[in-house]
A protein has these predicted regions:
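Proteins that catalyze or organize thiol-disulfide redox chemistry
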Residues: 1-73, 79, 90-97, 101, ...
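Hydrophobic anchor residue in the Rossmann-like NAD(P) cofactor-binding loop of oxidoreductases
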Residues: 109
């Protein structure tokens, strides 16, 4: 960065004004960073369109995954849970209905108790909708496809 120090042009003022001049090279660097960010956003949108099946999440991938996608619906379930098995095809279909806009993830609470404990999941099935890594809505128990769709639509951009 290039800084210039100039004497203030009013008489009897003994202070200096520091003026910052942004040079062409700095502008080029800023524009390159913006371009890379835009290219990454486009790449992420294309990747999002290609996700056709729910992602299997675990204690090690959970937080990275919810922060990676702009909108992700996570199903907290267990194999012995009848209502969870009943909801599975509805949740899978929701992912297909909103493909390119929403990612669906599934986390088996029996195999991944750490995340379940951290999020205070006490009943299953529990669905939590994350927007940019933050929980914005949730549903506990068996619900209709329409109810899940309403929740998703409220948070689509």
């Amino acid at each position: 960065m290039n800084y210039q120090i100039k004497k203030h042009n009013k008489p009897n003022h003994g202070f200096f004004v520091i003026q910052h001049k942004l040079e062409d090279e700095e502008l080029r660097i800023i524009n390159e960073k913006r371009m890379k960010k835009l290219q990454q956003e486009i790449k992420d949108k294309e990747y999002l369109k290609n996700i056709k099946e729910p992602l299997n999440l675990d204690d090690t991938t959970f937080y990275q995954t919810i922060n990676k996608f702009p909108l992700i619906l996570v199903d907290f379930w267990a194999p012995w849970c009848g209502p969870c098995r009943m909801m599975a095809p509805i949740i899978d279909q929701t992912g297909k209905d909103y493909q390119g806009k929403l990612v669906v993830g599934k986390l088996n609470v029996d195999e991944n108790p750490l995340v379940a404990r951290q999020l205070a999941i006490s009943s299953i099935p529990t669905l939590i909708l994350f927007k940019r890594g933050k929980a914005v809505s949730n549903i506990v128990g068996s619900v209709s496809k329409n109810r899940i769709g309403e929740m998703v639509k409220m948070h689509l951009e």
